[in-house]
Design a protein with these regions (language model features):
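Trp/Phe/Arg-rich N-terminal binding region typifying the photolyase-homology
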Residues: 2-234
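Glycine/tryptophan-enriched, flexible segments
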Residues: 39, 183-391
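Active-site loop/oxyanion-hole signature of alpha/beta-hydrolase fold enzymes
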Residues: 403-410, 415-418, 448-496, 532
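Serine-hydrolase catalytic-loop signature spanning alpha/beta hydrolases and amidase-signature enzymes
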Residues: 423, 431-441, 453
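Conserved loop-alpha-helix segment in the C-terminal half of the alpha/beta-hydrolase fold
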Residues: 446-448, 615-655
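Gly/Ala-rich beta-loop-alpha elbow adjacent to hydrolase catalytic centers
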Residues: 496, 500, 504
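Flexible "cap/lid" loop of the alpha/beta hydrolase fold
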Residues: 505-510, 514-551
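Conserved alpha/beta-hydrolase catalytic His-Asp/Glu region
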Residues: 529-534, 552-618
């Protein structure tokens, strides 16, 4: 008997606007005897971000029923968070999914609208007894699953309420997620083997006689999206579509300042080979069906071998262009396909390790991988799996002061929390090395004062993902911009501490419409009279000194973290408790933390606060602690008062204005 999935039955929602999943384990097994005896009724497989038949345990479990109905619903609540390029990928993936299912005598039903309405109708139409859906960690997707379950609870079905099973693709054989170490260092010591992917299941049941629906064109899909009643205002859509660098360099050019980038560089169009896997209009990411992704992955892994194939040469060229730092090209090229589930993480790992063994006569070296591309692919999916597991664990574990939510930004998992039901929107942004719990003593107090409060752990910190990429101030500012647009959905009062204050100032400078007011607490950044700063560049180069410096810094921080943090709380050292230090130490062992620390050596704070805030016409409050160990507080405060007359700047632990 082979265990293929660990779905869990949904419970009723526990409170208004909050859906909770009961963690009753239900092990789905497929044995030869079970294959011969089909379960009664039919099963609906609800595809969301699992657009494949390969290594799809939900489809495998459903194949044991008398009939299977694969379903994909173009739902505004999912699609509204996709870029146009991601929408293109969805269409190509669905085209391949339909083709693969038709080869087995099945199909995928295509519908437009609210998924709960279609599933409710289909249950009676096809006599479905079970619904299979992949378990998610993103808040909006978990909400949608909860809404489906609530709809079932209030509907009288002819043959009774169907069960909803949540399935996973287990990267590791983990019996109980709560038993998993919270430290990645301890997790690595377990040496858990990665499970092998499964092949596409055989759908031997009868084909249902239903209207499967046509696959839309991209224009049809865009028309549907434009009819979205919850569509963002056009001005906000434009805000997201223009990069921070583009806006900033345009502002600098108008003010006569210098930059190292030329925005008017024209790139000649490159003719794509006939078998190109770069299927979108922009052509920056790998797309198509599972087989196309596997072909591109084979080309990526074999980069050092060279090739005469045009399609593989194209992959190699894109790899070189996307390699902003060693290994960063993998997620740049394959990340969207992984996020849409066109290929599973463990399939990528399996293919990478298989190729590594082929290169080394069947052996794996204990000293690491033999090629950069194998390391990039294997490390990326292992890292993604770790953060997915930690996100899921934080969602199902009881306890803790604040409820955790997950938002996916550019393919990466970001943790945040929310408090308050009414009032103005407030967004709290932490400093370097911290996380949203930095404000654990403030969140509820601000909410009880009549506000709705969001606190986010930005990329690279806390329990948010720490990908292999180049970290810049503009990248973090864009994350905050998108969080306001996608999660909060309205202008906010922005509060930032330390380097988080600098990110907040950039957001206020570049996107006035998103910010109602700004509060900077011991903010990073300087004040330069008349903005006579050096030329700005968003280009960052990794170097040997930065590589070494990050490792020495990490070693030093782990040894001295308690004393360092206490210096930042000179009048309230009791706040530096065991939990805070333990969580900071835990995060220091996360995969990718060294990449984040390397960014310290390339921070570019050349844009002074006085420049960033001068065009912001709303209220600005600057709070500077006089015992701040990081800066010369008195000198900085005097400069702020002189060159930022629009800001109110009280002094903490000293004389006030």
């Amino acid at each position: 008997m082979a265990v293929i999935a660990f779905p869990r039955i949904l419970s009723r929602f526990l409170a208004p606007n909050h859906y909770s999943l009961r963690r009753n384990k239900c092990i789905c097994c497929v044995s030869p005897a079970a294959r011969e005896t089909k379960r009664k009724g039919s099963a609906i497989v609800w595809f969301k971000q699992d657009l494949r038949v390969d290594d799809h345990l939900g489809l495998m479990a459903a194949s044991n029923y008398q009939a299977v109905l694969p379903l994909y619903v173009f739902d505004h609540r999912i699609l509204s968070l996709y870029s146009d390029e991601m929408l293109e990928l969805v269409l190509f993936a669905l085209e391949d999914l339909r083709k693969s299912l038709k080869e087995q005598g099945s199909d995928v039903m295509i519908r437009f609208g609210r998924v709960e309405n279609f599933i409710k109708e289909l249950v009676d139409e096809v006599k479905a007894t079970s619904i299979f859906a992949e378990e998610e960690v993103e808040y909006h997707l978990r909400m949608m699953i909860g809404i489906v379950d609530e709809t079932f609870a209030t509907t009288n079905f002819k043959d009774g309420k169907p069960n909803i099973f949540l399935w996973q693709t287990p990267f590791y054989d983990i019996k109980n997620l709560n038993d998993l170490p919270v430290s990645h260092n301890d997790f690595v010591k377990l040496q858990l083997p990665v499970t092998s992917p499964t092949q596409s299941p055989t759908l031997s049941g009868s084909k249902l006689e239903v209207d499967w629906g046509p696959l839309p064109t991209f224009d049809d899909l865009k028309k549907f999206m434009n009819e979205n009643p919850w569509k963002l205002k056009e001005s906000w859509t434009l805000i997201k579509n223009i990069s921070a660098e583009t806006i900033l360099l345009e502002k600098l050019s108008k003010s006569g300042e210098r930059s190292k980038r030329n925005l008017n560089v024209n790139h000649a169009p490159v003719k794509k080979p006939d078998a190109s896997v770069f299927v979108t209009e922009k052509g920056n990411i790998v797309g198509g069906g599972t087989n196309a992704i596997l072909n591109a992955l084979a080309a990526y892994l074999r980069y050092l071998e060279g090739t005469a194939r045009d399609d593989w040469q194209e992959v190699h060229e894109r790899l070189r262009n996307a390699e902003s730092r060693d290994g960063a090209s993998f997620f740049t090229l394959f990340g969207p396909a992984l996020c849409l589930g066109i290929i599973s993480r463990r399939r990528v790992h399996y293919e990478a390790i298989k190729y590594e063994k082929e290169r080394n006569a069947g052996f794996l070296s204990p000293f690491g991988y033999s090629t950069v591309t194998v390391a990039a692919a294997a490390d990326a999916v292992c890292s993604m799996e770790w953060y997915w597991l930690m996100s899921l664990r934080s969602l199902i574990s009881e306890g803790g002061i604040y409820s955790t939510r997950i938002w996916r930004w550019n393919g990466y998992l970001i943790q945040y929390t929310v408090a308050g039901n009414e009032g103005p929107a407030v967004l709290l942004v932490h400093g370097f090395g911290a996380f949203f719990e930095h404000y654990r003593d403030n969140i509820y107090g601000i909410a009880e004062g009549g506000n709705r409060v969001w606190a986010v752990t930005v990329l690279g910190f806390g329990k948010s993902e720490k990908p292999n990429m180049v970290y810049t101030e503009l990248m973090w500012a864009e994350l905050l911009r998108d969080f306001v647009v996608e999660v909060v959905g309205e202008p906010v009062h922005l509060i930032g501490n330390s380097i988080g204050g600098y990110f907040v100032a950039i957001v206020a400078c570049l996107w006035h419409a998103l910010v109602k007011s700004v509060v900077l607490i011991n903010s990073a950044g300087n004040v330069v009279p008349e903005h006579s700063f050096t030329q700005f560049s968003n280009e960052r180069q990794t170097s040997g000194p930065a590589w070494l410096g990050a490792r020495l810094l990490l070693f030093y921080l782990r040894l001295n973290i308690s004393n360092i943090v206490k210096q930042c709380y000179p009048t309230r050292t009791e706040r530096v408790d065991d939990w805070l230090i333990g969580e900071m130490l835990r995060a220091s062992h996360d995969p990718g933390v060294l990449v984040v620390l390397e960014s310290i050596f390339s921070f570019n704070l050349s844009l002074p606060l006085s420049y960033l805030l001068e065009g912001f016409n709303e209220k600005v409050l600057i709070i500077q602690g006089m015992k701040d160990p990081i800066s010369d507080s008195k000198s900085k405060l005097d400069m702020l008062r002189e060159h930022c007359p629009w800001a109110i700047a009280p002094m903490m632990s000293g004389r006030k204005k």
